[in-house]
Every structure is written in C-alpha cells, then in structure tokens.
Amino acid sequence: MTTLSPEAFAGHTPMMQQYLRIKADHPDTLVFYRMGDFYELFFEDAEKAARLLDLTLTQRGASAGTPIKMAGVPHHAVEQYLAKLVKMGESVAICEQIGDPATSKGPVERKVVRVVTPGTLTDAALLSDKNDVYLLAMCTGHNKRGVAVNIGLAWLNLASGALRLAEIEPDQLGAALERIRPAEILTADGATDTVPAGAGAIKRVPAWHFDIASGTQRLCDQLDVAGLDGFGAHSLTSACGAAGALLLYAAATQGQQLRHVRSLKVENETEYIGLDPATRRNLELTETLRGTESPTLYSLLDTCCTTMGSRLLRHWLHHPPRASVAAQSRQQAIGALLDAPADASLDALRSALRQIADVERITGRLALLSARPRDLSSLRDTFAALPALRERISAIVANADALTRVDAALAPPAECLDLLTSAIAPEPAAMVRDGGVIARGYDAELDELRDISENCGQFLIDLEARERTRTGIANLRVEYNKVHGFYIEVTRGQTDKVPDDYRRRQTLKNAERYITPELKTFEDKALSAQERALARERALYDGVLQALLPFIPECQRVASALAELDVLAAFAERARTLDWVAPTFTDEIGIEIEQGRHPVVEAQVEQFIANDCRFGAERKLLLITGPNMGGKSTFMRQTALIALMAYVGSYVPAKSACFGPIDRIFTRIGAADDLAGGRSTFMVEMTEAAAILNDATPQSLVLMDEIGRGTSTFDGLALAWAIARHLLAQNGCYTLFATHYFELTQLPAEFPQAANVHLSAVEHGHGIVFLHAVNEGPANQSYGLQVAQLAGVPAPVIRAARKHLAYLEQQSATQNTPQLDLFSAPPAAADELECADAPAVSAIPHPALEKLRDIDPDDLKPRDALDLLYELRTLVRSHDADGHA
C-alpha cells in the first residue's frame, strides 16, 4: 500500500483525502469511486474517462485550491462502461461503500473490492461467450553469462480456472503469443523482452514478483501440493517465476483467493502439431485474412449447442495433438454418435445439450463469490438434467472410450444439487438486492419476515376478529397510520370492556386507541420486515455461496465433460450433414487423400471439384502449375486443413484419407507489406520462407505458393529453384509447391521425389473455363490474359497485351536466346555456340491484322461494320500489290 505524506492531504476535504489514499494504491488504473447511485471519477481519471467514454466532464468546487474535475456513470449501467474500457485495454478499480452512511462519522468507509483488467474478466457481461480470455505472464531465463536461454510462460483463464505453463526458445515468443492470444501480458519492470505489437495489453509489475523460488512456493500453495513433480513442472524454473507473478496479480485484482485454480497443465513443443502465426492466418482457422469471423474453419465446425463447447472447439483447432491416439479416440466417439439408436439419437442428444448452462464460467464466478442468483438456478437446472443426458449417452458408449469417460464424468454432484434445489427459488430475481432469491422453506426466519411483509393485511383482519370475540366489542377496529403505527380503536362507549393488556396510545374525542403486546411485536416486525427480509436473504445467499465452494472440483469436472461431449456431437453433426468420412492413421511416412474437398470453400459454392493428393517416401514434393484462379491455392489449403482436421479428431471432407506422422504445418501463401515493421512484401515472403527452410522436418507439411514473385524474374526463379531443391534434398518434408515458373517443372528430372501436377483449364475463344481438377504433369500455360479479362481489365489493355505477347513469342522463336534453363550446365561462351540459321520470318505485321486487332465488335454499328469491311479489303489488296506474302 502506498503511504502519502501529510503534506499531500493538506487543504483537502476528508472525502478527497480518502479518495487520494485509494488512488495512490492504483496510480495506473481508473478508479470508479462509489457515491450513492453513481461511480464518480476525479481529476485526471475524470478527464481520461470523459474522453474514452464520451462522458460529460464537470467541475464541482475545489479541494486544496484545485478545481475538482468529475465524471460519473450510473451504478446500474456500470458493466457497459467497463466493457468499453476493457476493450480499449484499460483497467478499472471498483471502489465500493462498505460502511453504513447512517452510522458513519465523516466519509463513509470505502475500499477497492476488485480490479477489472483485460485479462481478469469473469462477469458474463464483460466476456465473449465463445472466446476464452487469458492473462499471461512471461519471465526470461538467463545463463551465467546473462544470455537469455528461454522464456517461461504462465497463462490463466480466470473465468474457468485453467492454468498452463510452458518454456520456449526466445525466438518462439511470437508464435506462442499468436497461439495463446492473451488479453493482458505481465512483464517485469525493466525487462527488455520485445512483445510483438498487438499481442495484448502490457502491464508492468515489480521485478521481484517474478522471483523463481517465491513463484514455485506460491504455485505449490495454490495447488495445495508439496512439489510440482506430479505436474511435470519441477524443472520449469522460468515458467514458475512467471506463474508466481501471475497468481499474485490475479489474486490482487479479485481481492481474494483463487479457489478454482486447483490444477496445472504443462505444454511442451512436441505435444501439438506446430502452427506458426503465418499458418494460422493463411489457413483461416478462426479468422479470415480480412479479419472477419466467417467464413472460417471454426465458423463451419461450430454447431455446438453450448458456449463451453464452442470455446473448447476453438482450443482444439489451435492445439491439434501430434499423437494420433487422441484423434482416433474422438473419431471413435463420433462414429458411435452417428450409429446411435433411435431413442438416443444424435439430434435428441444435441437437443438436450441446448438446455445446458455455461457451467464452466458459473463455476469460476462461484469460486470468486460473485455468482448471481440466476447463475445458481442455471447450475441447478443443468445438474438436474444430467441423469436424462446420461441415459442417452449410456445407450451409445459401446466401443467408444471417450464417451465412456464423458459419461462417468457427468455424474451429478448430489449434495450440491440438493443444496441448490432447497436454497434457490425456482425463478430467482436477477440480483440479490431485489429479493425473491432464496426458496421458501429454506429458512424459517426469512419465511416469517416474508409472511409479515406480504400478509400484513390478513394478519390485521385475523387479529381484529380475535379481539372482537375476546372483548365482546363488536365495533373494535385494528388500523394503521404513519404517525402512530398500528393501533386498536375502541369507541368511548365501549372502553369499559377493554382488557387489562391494552395500553392507551392516543385519545380522540369519540374514541380511544390502544396497542397490545401482540400488536406491538407485530408492528416491530412489520415495519422493518421487508428491510430485514432483504438483509436476511443477503446473508443466506452468502452462506449458500460459501457452502457451494467445496463442490467446485465436481462442477469443473462436469463442465469439462459437457464441453467435450458437445464438440464431439458437433463433429458428428457436421460429418453427417456434409458427408465427411473418418480418416485413418499410419506410422509410415505419407499422406493419401482421395477426392478431398476444401471444407469452407465447398460450403460457399454450389459444386466443388474433389481432388486427390498423395505423398509418400518416394513422392515428397508436388510442383503445382496452372492458371491463376485455377484452384492451386485452394488445393494446397484443403490438403493442410484436411490433415489438421484429422489430427484434431474430426471427420474429413474426402472419400478416404490416411495420414502418417505430422509434426508441423507451414504455409507461405500470399504476402503483404509489413509497414509497421518496415518490411517489404518480398522481405515478408523471404522471412516466412527462411523459417520453413530452417525448421521443417521430414514429418512437416509445407505449403509454398508462388515463392519468388516479389522480385525480378531471374532472381525469383533462381530463389524458387534453390528453395524447392533444399526442401527436397535437406528438409525432406511433404511440400506443395505452386509456381508460375515453368522452368521448375524440370525439377523431377533431377529429383525423382518431386512430381508435376497441374490444374486444368479449357480455352474458349479469348476466354477460359477453369476445371479445378488436379492432373499429373505440368501445365502448358498460365492463361494470364484470360484471367485479366475475367477480372475486368479494360479491353484496349487486353488487346495491347495480346499484341505484345505475340511479339515476345515471335522474338523468342526468331532469336538465338534459348530459354533460361537452371537445370542444365552453364552456357558456353557466345563464340563457341554453333547455331543453325533460323528461318526468316517477317517482322512486319499485316496492316489488315493490325486493324482487326484494334476492333471491338461490340462497339460497332451495322453501317460502321460495313464501312470497315470495305476498308479491310482495300488494305489486303494494297498489301498484296506491294509484293508481301
């Protein structure tokens, strides 16, 4: 806690002194200071919030001679403002009134109850349903010479309690951050690690937070273990330092323990198929190249019925396991779901899943004691639905280990369900302060208070009837007014019948008003019943939250099983709807895809042409040629996507597919300037190519699209040849190599492991029809002019291009300049060449042909066409008369 000198408070009002003390502890955070029904911001915070949130900036008085600038937001709408600020990367300290204004001398006691930051969100209103939010800490490990040898990472999904550790090479930081996508990154003050732009909001914390010994102990305390050997994290010193800083920061933002962070997973490089940032972008797994969410592989696959399933699916797509065992287990479960009997059909199962709440995030809020009443009622209703869901699963678990495991994990926590059923009203109010949250029968005192509040009128009627009978006073009345409260009124002529326990409260001209001990007791209860009922309900609700804490592990178990079941059911639905098949796996080198289809493109077009793709020990590189728009990039991407889908555990869009081991997928497809990084298109292209050449192994799948096009023709061709040769001779990886350099089609003559394939097209007049079929052998041309015409290039430009193309082809045929051949021996000196005389070909074009080339028939009127015909005849006769052939 920051201590301010007395001089800092001089001249300030007591309330502003209180604010300044709180602000001193949160200097880099906006402080939302509760005052009545508003959260107020002062001074610089007010100016900043007014600018960011478009609030009205006001000025109210002065403190210590300084004008008090203010801006505020209503407490009931605070979440929408928090959401905007968090999206901008800001953090907000929520300062609440915790004292009683009625009993406080001076300012009401206030304190910061939580800090909302981009990486520590748990409120449903601040979270995206289908995206996880991660807080990440990074700690660099150094050797004795002070050289960085690794970077320890720890990242936490506070909404679910999932904590992970990893240690990576320093040059892998960008790829790791692209995979994890943290919302907030903790680094040490003075750290020199360069975090890629846009990777997440950066938060600097004191360097001592990353102390390895303290971090290891803090991690053990959090997990309630003596050591980390059981998690495989005992040797991850840098990661433990990062975890210590992360846990310290997360607990501080919540102002309490992280009760739901009870497990740890260590990720290592060899566990998942490697996907670098370029590959994730180019394959458009969860985001298109234009930055939209659809159409992507994720948007196609995500027919999940729960938000938990959608989030798990996203995680699976970015973490395809290298070992095929996990994929085979998932595909086995998909097959069982597709073959389910009628009474446990896939549709019935998915219908039941649609009724399931977001147990994962509700559990997170429960652990932080911030769960709202409807969270608990949703949790109760979900647990109550589990037995029926398990009945459907039990009918189809045969020969499906994944479903058997899920079924066992879905056993409802009986004690938890009993507590929720007895304590929470069937349809509770949204907030505890509104009342009606605790079920009737759970607490006798609350029921009595409610009865008093709700049945006051009936009690008075009953009391009046009893007192008339007891006293014999027929006109006795029980009434109420705001001045005197409840009373029994007796006319003056009947006062002699008043019992001894009546105490006079007021004398009127014609009547006396009394109160009895019973009525006084009721009055005390009735006048404060509603207020006391709300207070009692708040206390009971807090008690229910505390009583539910021991069930957090069981809730997490159920949430994990529900999410997995939902993803498997979504995979089964996609397989059935889109006619996908189960792939197979082998330990031998190779990829065999028969009639494969691009899953996303197929969903966007009426008809998709399926193609085969085959790799093996003797076939490692496919040189792909053919026209632009012919489907080269689609064919390449579909191969990678089918492979990734297979290892994720999905069925795949093909007639059949078999995969050998795959350790990484690389792509070099398309390029753009990196203006912020000062890199040209060609530099970006070469950087990606360098990463592939340095890291690809014989088990890697590489997609190379038109490498070398960003520089001069000869430079590009030479680079493309050398890169292809290196991929074959050194890396030995599966490579799809698309190119317009037809000289490269000679590569298989030198390397039998290379093969030519091409995308077919048919020329029709000056147009072209793309067949999108992959055939063996090289293409004969690229059809560039036809594609340009399809793109809408003006007709005069196309005509000029055709004219120049004819000239270039004519020059090539008449001159002694052989086409560049990178695969032959270097050419001899010019005087050593023996060249036969080339046949003479007139370089003077026929004037009639020249005239015809400049004509656009669509622009001719009938009369103009006739005149032109006569003109052409004249040109032909004149040309012949001059003795030209």
UniProtKB/Swiss-Prot annotation:
Molecular function, one GO term: damaged DNA binding
GO cellular component: cytosol
InterPro entries referenced in this protein's UniProt entry, alphabetically: DNA_mismatch_repair_MutS, DNA_mismatch_repair_MutS-lik_N, DNA_mismatch_repair_MutS/MSH, DNA_mismatch_repair_MutS_C, DNA_mismatch_repair_MutS_clamp, DNA_mismatch_repair_MutS_core, DNA_mismatch_repair_MutS_N, DNA_mismatch_repair_MutS_sf
Entries under CDD domains matching the protein: ABC_MutS1 (cd03284)
Keyword DNA damage part of the UniProt annotation: yes
Gene Ontology terms: biological process: mismatch repair
Gene3D superfamilies named in the record: 1.10.1420.10, 6.10.140.430, DNA repair protein MutS, domain I (3.40.1170.10), MutS, connector domain (3.30.420.110), P-loop containing nucleotide triphosphate hydrolases (3.40.50.300)
UniProt: ATP binding residues: 626-633
Keywords from the UniProt entry: ATP-binding, DNA damage, DNA repair, DNA-binding, Nucleotide-binding
SMART domains membership: MUTSac (SM00534), MUTSd (SM00533)
Function (record text): This protein is involved in the repair of mismatches in DNA. It is possible that it carries out the mismatch recognition step. This protein has a weak ATPase activity.
UniProt-listed PANTHER family: DNA MISMATCH REPAIR PROTEIN MSH1, MITOCHONDRIAL, DNA MISMATCH REPAIR PROTEIN MUTS FAMILY MEMBER
Family: Belongs to the DNA mismatch repair MutS family.
NCBIfam families in the record: mutS1, PRK05399.1
Protein name (Swiss-Prot/TrEMBL): DNA mismatch repair protein MutS
Annotated source species: Burkholderia ambifaria (strain MC40-6)
Lineage, broadest ranks: Bacteria, Pseudomonadati, Pseudomonadota, Betaproteobacteria, Burkholderiales
